[in-house]
Amino acid sequence: MVSVPGPVSLIEPLSGNTILVIKINALHVVKRSKYQEIIIADTEDFGRALILDEYIQSSYYDEAYYHESLVHPAMVTHISPRDVLILGGGEGATLREALKHSTVKRAVMVDIDEDVVELSKKYLPQMHQGVFEDPRAQVVIEDGFVYVEKALKNGDKFDVVIMDLTDPYSSEIAKQLYSPEFFKKLVGLLREDGIIVTQAGNSFFFPEAYDMVLHGVKSSFPVVAEYNVWIPSFGYAVNYIIGSLKYDPTSLTAEEVEKRLKERGVKTLFYSGKTHVGLMNLPIYRKIRHV
């Protein structure tokens, strides 16, 4: 750890006109990998954080808001998720949440950047909580696009695909994984009642990028649900999109969600039955936008 001798801040661009300034207390990692700049730092307000190419990916104090909202709405909507594919999520928190579901027999996490995974194992224990040692977990260091094409050729099948990638507008690495063509490939990777969920960045600052992802999901899935969650360390509400071949996440009651969480032994800090119902009810301005 390197203590910061004076006032040092992360200046994160939220848009072309707005920035978020976050005070840094200590630096644990500053490294440029083959793909991106990696920083792991202790922040004043959000605790330890993983920062990629100047964007906070997750932080100790609010990561549960992000990861639980990404994982559990889709997982709970599926009646019995056994095989789960995670694209991205190198810090291990998405894998951690997926494996809370006792129905899961296999969770494959595919991340292109081995440095992110290895540095997270060492410096972000509160994120992964030892999940990499779970016998149900498989970690593959590979481009997600390449992995999916190989899995299709091999006839592999999944019940749930979780896309925990960098934003479609903040990095070049993941852009092709948000394309309509890629979502069509994911349909081929799913069982007949499969579900995907992706984080889709921020629709307030980047509506065109968000709409691109939304239209891509809608072009491949008969059931689509949108929701968003405010993440303090991001400085904005993150958008999520679910694409489902059968089950409708908006049809679940709070009681049904709680029943499935209890049956599967899932304990959470943010997500609940009432939270699920609230997430699936878009604000008026979002509903109007899609009329």
Swiss-Prot record:
Principal cellular location given in the protein's record: cytoplasm
Location of the active site: D164
Domain PABS: 5-245
Cysteines engaged in disulfide bonds, as pairs: none
Keyword line: Cytoplasm, Polyamine biosynthesis, Spermidine biosynthesis, Transferase
EC number: 2.5.1.16
Listed GO MF terms: spermidine synthase activity; thermospermine synthase activity
Gene3D superfamilies attached to this UniProt entry: Spermidine synthase, tetramerisation domain (2.30.140.10), Vaccinia Virus protein VP39 (3.40.50.150)
Gene Ontology CC terms: cytoplasm
Pathway assigned to this chain's UniProt record: Amine and polyamine biosynthesis; spermidine biosynthesis; spermidine from putrescine: step 1/1
Catalytic activity: S-adenosyl 3-(methylsulfanyl)propylamine + putrescine = S-methyl-5'-thioadenosine + spermidine + H(+)
Job of this protein: Catalyzes the irreversible transfer of a propylamine group from the amino donor S-adenosylmethioninamine (decarboxy-AdoMet) to putrescine (1,4-diaminobutane) to yield spermidine.
NCBIfam families: PRK00811.1
Protein name: Polyamine aminopropyltransferase
Organism from which the protein derives: Pyrobaculum islandicum (strain DSM 4184 / JCM 9189 / GEO3)
